[in-house]
Design a protein with these regions (language model features):
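Feature captures the FAD/FMN-dependent oxidoreductase FAD-binding
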Residues: 80, 142, 147-151, 199-269, ...
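FAD-site-proximal beta/loop scaffold in flavoenzymes
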Residues: 275-308, 394, 406-484
């Protein structure tokens, strides 16, 4: 422990964002450059905890060695801190930018004071590692002669690929989009995660021996989902290749399904006027925008433009905030965010004790931007969408009603508050209401069993820790197995699945995985 009294001497400070009114003029990353001296001071706030809950079940899902690298940063030993960080996290430059940081919610210091700024420190470590040239390709010295196919190039698929390649297996990753990265590339906008950051890591994996195949759908042409965001990304070049998953299984020694949860949940499906033009899924909006940005700096007019439009985003969370931020950068006339739940408390409620994730009021980057631009927080809480209204088939407004929850935590049914009806002007509506599971055509072709772990959600049946499906040699990891979740959980799943595959192929494994502590391979 570098400074035993650091948590008493120093207050929490975080890396600043660029000015809201400046950053909405571009899609550059919102983070400013960190002050490394300040970060060393922040690392000193890490306490000598008897039990570091930041690494517990309620903390970091990949068991990052947070106290260790905080201590090393305080001592100025950045390269050693990077080695500790990479032991448990293949992609700290992703989690350091987009993770909500459950580790900070479980920080022991958080009981009496603001938590250690773990996420900022993590991001600074890996960014310095790249800038100093410490992070270089390390291909395996020998190959095992075994081959693994991974379907999906999101964080789960990439983490599995990194681990399996590192141990010497030949890995091929299939992606139906035109760029590798899955959610990291097209689901998270550039101002939160610059795509050069994603491509930098993908190129590193390629240099280490991972093979990437894009524009390839694992399934039949007739089963390709109509109107899906990936079809949008391929319809212009007409270069999509189709591969039979059963043949893929025969061609490789093992197969990992890491396809994500891409079937959107639409709570407005039965609302009058749902068929009106102008209502889109959040992923359609964000994906089209990022592709247009990368292809042409938005000059090809291939995206959904919010310029001069009244925009309503239905659903909170990160995706809802990203729709707000993207709409502001387009130059929308107004933006409102409907949230069905009540406004959270400013501080933890008695029913939400530490070290559980704190359900409190937060202002995300996009909320701050909307307030700076339009003068008010864009969120309308306890608001239920009742109907869409329009003219000549085109959306013109949204009817809502306020709801009353019988319990503040929202676990009991709500009642509508009569007399609270309102008509909101709307030219565009984006549905940021989550996902119900993976597309089922490829699992069906492989004969995989499905399960319903959470209500309407349906995922590929594969036990956590084993990741084996109903078909020998076929594994599942990430959101397609777990259900929609965080990038850090996807990395957890990818690392765990990699170890399971390695054990299947070799009879044993020396690969580390969450919950299994060993030196980096």
């Amino acid at each position: 422990m570098g400074k035993p009294t650091g948590f008493q001497e120093f207050s929490r400070q975080t890396v600043a964002y660029r000015d809201p009114l400046t950053r909405i003029d571009d899609f550059d990353e919102i983070l400013t450059a960190p002050d490394e001296d300040r970060l060393q001071t922040q690392a000193a706030r890490c306490m000598d905890c008897g039990v570091p809950f930041c690494q517990s079940d309620t903390g970091c899902p990949i068991n990052n060695l947070i106290p260790e690298w905080n201590d090393l940063i305080y001592d100025g030993r950045w390269q050693e801190a990077l080695e500790r960080l990479h032991r448990t996290n293949n992609f700290p430059e992703f989690t350091g930018r987009v993770c909500p940081a459950p580790c900070e919610g479980a920080c022991v210091l958080g009981i009496i004071a603001p938590a250690v700024s773990i996420k900022n420190i993590e991001n600074a470590i890996v960014d310095r590692g790249f800038s100093e040239g410490w992070i270089v390709a390390q291909p395996p010295a020998t190959r095992t002669g075994k081959s693994v196919a991974i379907v999906g190039s999101g964080p789960a698929g990439l983490a599995a690929a990194a681990q399996l390649n590192k141990i010497g297996h030949q890995v091929t990753v299939y992606e139906r989009a035109d760029r590798i990265g899955g959610l990291l590339m097209y689901g998270i906008p550039n101002m939160k995660l610059d795509k050069q950051t994603v491509e930098r890591r993908v190129n590193l994996l390629r240099d280490e021996g991972v093979t990437f195949v894009t524009r390839t759908h694992i399934g039949k042409p007739e089963d390709f989902p109509q109107g899906h965001v990936n079809q949008i990304m391929t319809e212009r070049d007409q270069r999509l290749t189709f591969l039979d998953p059963t043949q893929l299984r025969k061609d490789f020694d093992a197969l990992i399904m890491a396809t994500g949860a891409t079937r959107p949940f639409d709570p407005t499906a039965r609302c009058p006027g749902r068929e009106l033009s102008g209502i889109h899924s959040a992923m359609d909006f964000l994906t089209r925008n990022t592709k247009s940005l990368l292809d042409s700096q938005l000059t090809d007019n291939a995206g959904i433009s919010a310029k001069d439009k009244h925009v309503i985003v239905i659903g909170g969370g990160d995706t809802g905030a990203d729709c707000i931020g993207t709409s502001l950068r387009h130059g929308c006339r107004s933006v409102v965010n409907f949230e069905l739940m009540n406004r959270p408390p400013v501080e933890r409620a008695a029913s939400n004790p530490w070290p559980a994730w704190p359900t409190i009021q937060r202002t995300d980057y996009a909320h701050a931007e909307a307030e700076a631009k339009h003068g008010a927080d864009p969120r309308a809480y306890a608001t239920l969408t009742k109907a869409f209204v329009g003219e000549s088939g085109r959306l013109a407004g949204v009817k809502t009603i306020k709801v009353d929850w019988s319990k503040p935590d929202g676990r009991a049914p709500f009642t509508e508050i009569h007399g609270s009806e309102k008509l909101w002007p709307a030219d565009l509506v984006f549905l940021a209401t989550g996902f119900v599971g993976p597309e089922k055509t490829t699992p069906d072709l492989l004969g995989l069993n499905m399960q319903n772990p959470r209500g309407n959600w349906e995922t590929i049946a594969a036990e956590h820790g084993a990741f084996t499906t109903s078909e020998p040699g076929v594994f599942a990891a990430g959101d397609c197995r777990r259900g929609q979740s965080l990038v850090v959980w996807a990395i957890n799943e990818g690392r765990g699945a990699a170890r399971a595959v390695d054990e299947y192929l070799m009879g044993y494994s020396t690969l580390p995985a969450p919950g299994i502590t060993m030196a980096s391979v």
